[in-house]
């Protein structure tokens, strides 16, 4: 797997989502988090004779309701010129094989609301919208503020 391709696909996805200005990661961070001593995130790549055409970036989750580990697919991206060739399906198949091999129960992901072609692909493969649930995110200052409150309450980060 080419590290540079993984980073380039992350940047291409951000550009596609009209969010290039929000990418904070660097090639060095991709190397450390995906290929360092203790990776916690993985990338499955699909290539053809023209090179790497797509990527599914994922990490392990846990479902208390299922009592099982699972996969959260953080990013799925196929280069525009390679769409319609079944590459997204191949990436999903690879993740399904990993899940089946490990006995994991569930795969989850999010999709931007205006990306109807992706929504159509996900539904075609058996994905379901989770009615009544919203995704939330916390980045930066709110995290720091909560950590400071925790320190003031005598908490530590020890696991």
Predicted regions and their residues:
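A short helix-loop-beta-strand connector motif used in the catalytic cores of GNAT acetyltransferases and
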Residues: 32-45, 72
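Conserved beta-strand in the GNAT
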Residues: 45, 51-60
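Conserved acetyl-CoA-binding loop-helix of GNAT-fold acetyltransferases
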Residues: 78, 84-97, 120-124
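C-terminal "cap" of GNAT-fold acetyltransferases
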Residues: 105-159
């Amino acid at each position: 797997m080419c590290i540079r391709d993984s980073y380039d696909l992350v940047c291409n996805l951000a550009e596609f989502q009209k969010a290039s200005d929000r990418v904070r990661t660097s090639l060095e961070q991709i190397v450390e988090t995906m290929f360092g001593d203790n990776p916690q995130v993985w990338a499955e790549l699909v290539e053809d004779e023209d090179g790497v055409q797509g990527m599914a970036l994922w990490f392990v989750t846990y479902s208390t309701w299922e009592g099982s580990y699972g996969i959260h697919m953080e990013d799925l991206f196929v280069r525009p010129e390679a769409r319609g060739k079944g590459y997204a399906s191949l990436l999903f198949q690879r993740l399904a094989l990993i899940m089946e091999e490990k006995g994991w129960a569930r795969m989850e992901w999010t999709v931007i609301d205006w990306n109807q072609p992706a929504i159509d692909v996900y539904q075609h493969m058996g994905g379901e919208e989770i009615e009544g649930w919203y995704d939330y995110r916390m980045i930066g200052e709110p995290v720091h503020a909560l950590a400071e409150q925790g320190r003031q309450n005598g908490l530590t980060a020890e696991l």
